[in-house]
Every structure is written in C-alpha cells, then in structure tokens.
Amino acid sequence: MAIGQYTSDLEPGDILGPVEYTLSPFVVREYCHANELHQPFFQGRQDEIVMPPTLIHLDKLRLYKHACPKGTGPSARIHYEYDCTVHEAVKVGARLSVSGTVRERFTKRGREHIVVEMELRSADDGRLLIAYRDTVLVAFKPAGGAA
C-alpha cells in the first residue's frame, strides 16, 4: 500500500479513500473561471450551479493528499489521458464521497504509467454520479538509466 508514501509508489490494488466532502459554489466558480467555462449552469445562481465533469480531477488530488501525503515523489506525474462518464448532474451543496482503486501499473516506451479508476457518489444514498478512469505518466527511465 502507498498509504503515507508518494503517489509514485502506488501499486495495483491500492485503495484510495473514500473521502467525503460538500461541493462548494466557490470551488465550482473558481475552477470554471480558471478554465473559461462561463456558462450560467456553472457560474449562475447558486441553486442552479452544477459541477463541470472535469472538476473530478480535483477529487483525484484530494485522494492523493489523503493516501500519499508525502506528495508526488522523486518524479513528477503527467496527466496523460482520462475518461469520464457522468451518470447524473452534481449540484452545488451536494454531500459527496469519492473513492478510487489503482487498476494497473505498466511501462511503455520507457515511461511508467498508473491507471486509477474513481467513483464519485452521493454521500447521502450512494448513487453513482460520475465514473472516472485516469492514466498518468509517473516517470521516464531512459535505457540503462535512472528515472
């Protein structure tokens, strides 16, 4: 397990979370402002604001912070690709629970990859709101060299 270590130490089968929190309008508005998402359903009236699907990237960081408090490790990670399936809109003020599982770790062309699958659920009734699969490059190891 990577608990208490670096994100670069994650191995298949490691469980991240669950972490519970309440989605705040401030986080949604600031994220949307930074990403130039100016549509009213992201930055309008508070009772109408929904979470943009890509905001789940912050949940991955939330899980890393709890499971791997030492940070990224000797090699920074690069967000490589992701797939996000939204099952239901997530409104501001919702109580949420996010959890993840490390599914794969592999090397391709000298680059180490880690695949994490996450689920964002309603903390009230367990409904699946968003399913997310993320692949990050953890390190590059040149032939015969260190990362």
Give the role of each language-model region:
Residues 1-81, 143-147:
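Hot-dog-fold acyl-thioester-processing enzymes
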Residues 1-7, 86-147:
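HotDog/MaoC-like acyl-thioester-processing domains
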